[in-house]
A protein has these predicted regions:
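Functionally critical loop-and-helix segments that line ligand-binding/catalytic clefts
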Residues: 114, 235-260, 265-269, 273-403
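Short "repeat-start/strand-capping" segments in structured domains, especially the N-termini
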Residues: 29-32, 56-57, 86, 107-110, ...
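Acidic Gly/Asp/Thr-rich repetitive segments characteristic of extracellular carbohydrate-active
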Residues: 1-27
Length: 403
C-alpha cells in the first residue's frame, strides 16, 4: 500500500513523498493527492506496476517512476489505473521503463497531463509497451505529454469521447494509434521520426485538427476504415520511405496521407509537402470531400487506384498543387484548366517503375498527347476542376518550435 511509504501530510487527503529512492510496487486504494518532492523516485524492482490506482479521485503529481515490470501480457505499467479509479489525474511525472508508461483500463474522466515517458531502448520495438494506453475509456484528457522510444506513443482501443491535445511523440512505431474508437479529438499534437505518425483505424467521427508529422517513415497520416471524420489544418512534411516494416499495409513508401477504404470524410486546409508521395487513395475510398489542401514538392503528388472518377474540389474550390502548369486569366485565384494528376501514363509508371528512365522521352510525350487528343482512351482518375493558384494558409501549430 502507498501507506507504507514515509508520507508527510500536506493538507486534507493530501500527502507529500520526500526525496529518496523507494523500492517496490505500491497501490493507492483511497481518494487522495500524492505529490512527490524533487528527487523522490519509486523503483519497482523490475516487477509489476510501480503504482496502481484503485480508487476514484486520485491525483499523482511530480513523481519519478522507474524499473517496472516488462511483462506485456500482464499489462505491466509505471501507472496502472483500474476500472474503479474514475477521475484520476496523473500529472507532471517522469517515467522510464520497459512496458507501458500509463495504462488506463475501462474507467472514465481521467486526466493525463504533462508527463514525460521514456521507453527502454535495449528492447526491440515490438517488445516495449506503449507510452499511454487507453482501453475502454471514456472522457479522458491526454494533454501535453512527451513520449519517446516506446512502441506506440498513445494507443486508443475501444475508447470513445476522449481528447488528445498538444502531445509530443518521437522515435516510436506509431505516434498516435486508434482502433475501434469513436468521437475522439486529436488536436495540436506533434509526431517526429515515427514509422507512422497518425495511424487512424476502424473508427468514426474523429476530429483531427492542427497536428504535425515531421520526418516520419512510411506514413504521415494513415486512414484505414475511417468514416465521418474531419482532418483540418494538419501539416505533414518529409515522410520518408522506410520500407514496409512490421504491421504495415503493403506499399508504405513515404506517403504523407494514405486513405484506405475510408468514406464520408472531410479533408481540408491541410498541407502535405516534401514527401515521397503526397496522397494515396485506394480500396473503395469514396465520397470524401477533399479541398483547400496544399500538395507541395512531393516526389509524386497523387496515386489513385480505383475504377471511378473522383472530383477533388468542393463548392468551386479545389487544392493547391505545386506542379500545376495551368494559368489564371481572370485573377480569381483558380486555375482555368483542371488538374489531372494521374493519367494512363502515370498508371504505366506505377506498374513498371523502370519506365521512369524514359520519363522525358519523346515516346512518353506522344502517349500523353494521344491521351489528351483522344479522351475516349482515358481511364478513371482524380480531377481537380478548380485548382488553387496559391497554397491556403493553415492555422499555426502550438509547437512551432518544440524543445
Amino acid at each position: 500500500s502507498i501507506r507504507s511509504l514515509p508520507l508527510q501530510p500536506d493538507g486534507e487527503a493530501r500527502w507529500r513523498l520526500p526525496a529518496g529512492e523507494y523500492w517496490g510496487q505500491f497501490r493507492i486504494e483511497e481518494s487522495l493527492m500524492l505529490r512527490c518532492e524533487a528527487g523522490a523516485v519509486i523503483n519497482a524492482e523490475g516487477e509489476g506496476n510501480a503504482l496502481t490506482i484503485a480508487a476514484p479521485n486520485v491525483t499523482v503529481q511530480g513523481c519519478t517512476l522507474t524499473n517496472w515490470g516488462s511483462n506485456l501480457t500482464k499489462l505491466n505499467a509505471a501507472v496502472f489505473i483500474q476500472r474503479e479509479a474514475s477521475h484520476a489525474k496523473v500529472q507532471a511525472n517522469r517515467m522510464q521503463g520497459p512496458a507501458s508508461g500509463i495504462w488506463v483500463d475501462g474507467t472514465s474522466n481521467v486526466s493525463l497531463l504533462d508527463n514525460v515517458i521514456e521507453g527502454e531502448l535495449r528492447l526491440r520495438s515490438q517488445d516495449r509497451g506503449n507510452g499511454i494506453h487507453l482501453y475502454a475509456v471514456h472522457g479522458a484528457r491526454v494533454i501535453g505529454n512527451r513520449v519517446r522510444h516506446a512502441r506506440d506513443g498513445i494507443y486508443i482501443d475501444t475508447s470513445n469521447g476522449n481528447s488528445l491535445e498538444g502531445n509530443q511523440l518521437e522515435d516510436l512505431r506509431y505516434g498516435i494509434h486508434y482502433m475501434f474508437s469513436n468521437d475522439n479529438r486529436v488536436i495540436g499534437n506533434l509526431t517526429r521520426r515515427t514509422r507512422t505518425g497518425y495511424a487512424l483505424m476502424q473508427s468514426r467521427k474523429l476530429t483531427v485538427i492542427g497536428n504535425r508529422s515531421e520526418q516520419d517513415q512510411n506514413y504521415g497520416i494513415l486512414m484505414n476504415y475511417i468514416t465521418y471524420s474531419t482532418l483540418r489544418d494538419n501539416l505533414v512534411t518529409e515522410v520518408r520511405d522506410g520500407g514496409a516494416g512490421e504491421g504495415m499495409i503493403s506499399g508504405s513508401e513515404g506517403k504523407a496521407l494514405f486513405i484506405y477504404n475510408s468514406l464520408f470524410n472531410r479533408i481540408e486546409h491541410n498541407r502535405f509537402e516534401r514527401s515521397a508521395l503526397g496522397i494515396h487513395l485506394t480500396a473503395g475510398s469514396e465520397d470524401n470531400l477533399i479541398s483547400d489542401n496544399a500538395f507541395i514538392n512531393n516526389r509524386q503528388q497523387v496515386k489513385y487506384v480505383a475504377s471511378r472518377r473522383q472530383e477533388w474540389s468542393v463548392a468551386g474550390r479545389g487544392n493547391y498543387w505545386s506542379d500545376y502548369l495551368g494559368w489564371d486569366r481572370n485573377n480569381d485565384g483558380l486555375g482555368e484548366v483542371a488538374y489531372e494528376p494521374n493519367d494512363n501514363v502515370d498508371r504505366l509508371l506505377w506498374r513498371y517503375p523502370q519506365v521512369r528512365l524514359l520519363m522525358n522521352s519523346p515516346g512518353i510525350e506522344v502517349l500523353r498527347w494521344a491521351q489528351r487528343a483522344f479522351p475516349i482512351i482515358k481511364s478513371p482518375g482524380v480531377q481537380d476542376s478548380y485548382p488553387l493558384m496559391q497554397p491556403p494558409a493553415i492555422a499555426p501549430h502550438p509547437q512551432e518550435n518544440p524543445s
